A protein has these predicted regions:
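Surface polyanion/phosphate-binding segment centered on an Asp-His-Pro turn
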Residues: 13, 17, 70-162, 241, ...
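Active-site palm subdomain of RNA-directed nucleic acid polymerases
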Residues: 6-17, 394-412, 435-437, 514-545
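Metal-dependent phosphoesterases centered on the DNase I-like endonuclease/exonuclease/phosphatase
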Residues: 3-69, 119-132, 199, 222, ...
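Basic, alpha-helical interaction scaffolds
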Residues: 114-148, 607-677
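Basic/polar low-complexity segments
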Residues: 49, 62, 99, 141-144, ...
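Conserved pre-catalytic core of RNA-dependent polymerases
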Residues: 264, 291, 295-507, 546, ...
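Catalytic palm subdomain of template-directed nucleic-acid polymerases
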Residues: 25-36, 451-469, 543-568, 680
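Short, conserved micro-motifs composed of acidic
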Residues: 54-71, 77, 295, 562, ...
Length: 817
């Protein structure tokens, strides 16, 4: 406990950390209890121990050098035995060099000084000219607004020093600094004490003004942020961190767009050639549509378009003719023309050509990957605002058609109301826990697709939309136009590659792309179900799980392998590349059952074998073979301490209100992510996250580590971690009982109906609690833990009329008194 308290303190220090000392136990013996405990604590606090060589004459590693895991300023680490001591010297260098400031050029427009009324008036006049088609109308709209932007806010290029930004600086501070310098010169020329005191007063005044200005500026930016992405950007600005993703250094800025464009295009072309050359047979025929077809899209009113625009995030893309701020200010005048473009597109079944171009930015997949290897980058598409608006209108009508005809797969949780990664994982974990509780072994298999969105075959997709999902007429023509003649260009540092034609795939940055992918892969559910294997989808993430007695583990592996081979054959036939190398498999059971299994087990496929892993990462949650979730908890704590330290480094510039918003968005959101999976875990596991929450509360309120934590949590009105878990589980129970949760969760909860007259018969919302065998396994399943906690709530609380009313009452009920 003392080491945890020490690390709690040092891990949140905003400065570079070097912690040296003789910890008096052997780091070179990883199986020792002390070593395991301190290594886990270091990992949880986002710290690393750098000394790996022996530091003692007896060959043990006793002396440690601890730094933050994200820091890399220690170089040339060495252990030397030249000193006359039984301990060796730990030698290292510090990289504290500073980079030279460079000059940079930027093209800017003075949007603030644009006369909105004059701009809108000219736009209304020029856009009134009739156009024969949706493409002509969209092109005229785009060129007109771009012309007006050049007229009212011409682009200018400026070169200036690349110095740290100081948006908080204002003329009053500049005037105070001049007075301070004047007072300093006077004091240094006279040497009088009274002049020194005057200078010190001016110095204090300037310091206080700068501090207040920084605090007010940071507070306003943070409180006005509307998304986590905006908060991240604000924090990076305050910390002086670079927002740009690392890029290869082996090419010039002018060469990079063409290099990336060629790489991305060649990669997809090679995948398609490989898939086309691989023989395959359809495993099952697609189901036929029976219902009310969608033959045409319904035109929308200006009010409907305005409502959709206000529900969207208005962000500027380089393909937009005017920036988002000008769009927002001029929207009442532009809305009739925008509505006309959308309705002509819907009625004619055509998508304007100008909407079919995407700008692609290469993004490094993980921060620790080599940026000089192009395989470590993924293409991220950016589309114009109007194209996404048109897709949003179509998606609204498409979703209505799909829900009316009940066409969505019940175990597909992506892009659906009331569904999330947490509900998907809760369903999977419920099945695995119940299987383990019954004494069985489960096999969880996670499938990985290579460039899943980019290899979709357009003809197969259109055929499936028509025959399986009942889309005909001009609606089908619209989707045909949407997929035909699409282009993309790569944009890197204001340099753009030539457009490349896309013969397959759907754009990932689009509104419709992910939904079209789920419809494209919908028949895969029938392939897996044909083998009687449980499954769940989340976009392109597919998981299969089956269970059997430990003695039948080989049969379990064989069944899954047969299913996997059929899935792979179906995917190949549908031009999707299943990646064997990244597919993972894990056996799940009690510690005793897992220990009794042979150590050489693997999933044997046609051409390869997949080794059995001890843990897998599924939708952001690390699952282990005993479902203890210790690695997930440790990873969550590590991420939280990283962000707490970043917030700590700018805490002096933040108000309590702004700090609270940052901590809520960046730290508590991680503690709460999928925390319903942690229900009924031992207190020793939960206390790791509770310690994170305690440190977050102290950081917000600027309290010492010795201050009692309960009053601080009460002051912030925060539920402790255990109660936050109960809050999430009970909220999902309420939604399940009231049909506001996925069917796969509602179906595992059942109203209790006693076989004879009992007092509980008077409770219409009492849930049946299934019986379990193992006290540490079965009660953790949602179908057990949910009813157990639900039945303990007052009936008046369970009968609340809405989720918001229930959650408000639930927080009061769970809050420590």
């Amino acid at each position: 406990r003392s080491s945890d308290l020490l690390l709690d303190h040092y891990s949140l220090l905003p400065h570079k950390l070097i912690l040296l000392g003789d910890l008096n136990f052997h780091f070179d013996e990883p199986d020792r209890h002390d070593t395991k405990r301190i290594c886990l604590s270091l990992h949880n606090h986002n710290l690393q121990q750098l000394v790996t060589s022996p530091t003692h004459c007896l060959g043990h590693t006793l002396d440690w050098l601890i730094t933050h895991d994200s820091d890399n300023f220690i170089t040339h680490l060495d252990v030397s035995s030249v000193l006359p001591s039984d301990h060796f010297a730990v030698l290292f260098s510090l990289d504290i060099s500073s980079s030279m400031r460079k000059k940079r050029s930027a093209t800017i427009r003075n949007i603030k000084n644009v006369d909105r009324q004059a701009f809108s008036s000219e736009a209304t006049t020029l856009l009134s000219e009739p156009c024969p088609s949706s493409s002509d109308l969209a092109s005229h709209y785009h060129s007109t607004l771009h012309h007006l932007l050049d007229k009212h806010a011409p682009a200018t290029t400026r070169t200036f020093p690349d110095r740290p930004s100081a948006p908080w600086f204002h003329p009053e501070i500049a005037n105070a600094k001049r007075q301070r310098r004047r007072a300093e010169r006077r004091w240094r020329s006279t040497g009088l004490t009274v002049h020194k005191q005057i200078f010190q007063a001016h110095r204090t005044k300037v310091s206080n003004m700068i501090s207040s200005a920084k605090t007010e500026h940071s507070r306003n930016r943070i409180l006005n942020a509307t998304s986590s992405k905006e908060l991240f950007s604000t924090m990076n600005d305050l910390l002086g961190s670079s927002k740009d993703s690392p890029l290869p250094t082996t090419f010039t800025d002018q060469e990079l767009p063409s290099v990336f464009s060629s790489f991305f295009s060649t990669k997809i072309d090679n995948l398609r050639k490989k898939l086309d050359a691989t023989p395959s047979q359809p495993t099952l025929s697609d189901p036929s549509f029976s219902g009310t077809p969608l033959s045409s899209f319904t035109p929308v009113s200006q009010q409907e378009v305005d409502k959709i625009i206000k529900s969207m995030s208005l962000k500027t893309c380089e393909l937009d003719p005017i920036p988002a701020s000008l769009y927002s200010d001029c929207l009442p005048h532009l809305l009739p023309f925008i509505t006309d473009i959308i309705n002509i597109s819907l009625q004619t079944g055509t998508v304007p050509d100008i909407f079919k171009t995407a700008l692609v930015r290469p993004l490094l997949k993980k921060h620790n990957l080599d940026p000089n290897d192009l395989k470590n980058f993924r293409p991220v598409s950016n589309l114009s605002f109007l194209s996404k608006l048109l897709e949003k209108v179509v998606l609204t009508q498409l979703n209505l058609h799909l829900s009316t005809n009940d066409l969505l797969q019940p175990f597909q949780s992506a892009y659906r109301q009331h569904h999330s990664t947490e509900t998907a994982l809760l369903h999977i974990l419920n099945d695995l826990l119940l299987s383990t509780d019954s004494g069985n072994i489960s096999l969880l298999t996670l499938l990985d697709l290579s460039s899943a969105f980019d290899t979709i075959d357009h003809s197969i997709l259109l055929n499936r939309l028509q025959n399986t999902f009942g889309i005909h007429g001009s609606a089908l023509s619209w989707f045909t136009s949407y997929l035909t003649d699409r282009f993309q260009s790569v944009l890197v540092k204001n340099h753009q590659s030539n457009p490349v034609h896309l013969s397959c795939g759907v754009p990932q940055g689009s509104v419709l792309g992910p939904v079209l992918f789920t419809l494209y892969t919908s028949p895969l559910s029938h392939v897996i179900r044909n083998h009687n294997i449980n499954h769940h989808f989340y976009a392109d993430d597919t998981q299969m799980h089956d269970n059997d007695k430990p003695d039948n583990v080989q049969a379990l592996l064989s069944r899954t392998a047969d299913c996997y081979n059929d899935v792979k054959d179906w995917m190949t036939h549908n031009k999707l590349q299943l990646n064997d190398d990244k597919t993972e498999a894990m056996l799940v059971g009690t510690r005793q059952k897992i220990a009794q299994l042979p150590t050489s087990l693997s999933l044997q496929l046609d051409n390869t074998s997949i080794p059995i892993s001890d843990s897998v990462k599924n939708l952001g949650v690390i699952l282990d073979s005993t479902l203890s979730l210790q690695k997930f908890i440790s990873s969550t704590a590590q991420s939280c301490y990283f962000h707490l330290r970043r917030i700590s480094s700018i805490r002096k510039c933040l108000s309590i209100e702004a700090t609270l918003k940052l901590v809520t968005s960046l730290v508590l959101s991680r503690i709460d992510y999928c925390n319903s999976l942690l229900v009924c875990l031992p207190d020793s596991s939960i206390k790791v996250l509770q310690r994170v929450q305690n440190n977050a509360a102290r950081l917000i309120l600027l309290k010492k580590k010795s201050d009692h934590i309960s009053p601080l949590l009460n002051q912030l009105h925060w539920l402790p971690v255990s109660q936050r878990i109960q809050y999430k589980v009970l909220s999902l129970c309420y939604k399940s009982v009231n049909n506001s949760a996925p069917a796969y969760l509602s179906n595992v909860l059942h109203i209790y109906t006693p076989s004879r007259s009992l007092r509980s018969a008077s409770d219409p919302l009492c849930l049946r609690i299934p019986r379990t065998k193992l006290a540490t396994v079965g009660p953790r399943a949602f179908s057990v833990s949910g009813p157990s906690s639900w039945n303990k709530l007052p009936l008046s609380l369970r009968q609340k009329p809405s989720p918001s009313a229930f959650q408000a009452g639930l927080k009061t009920f769970l809050f420590p008194h």
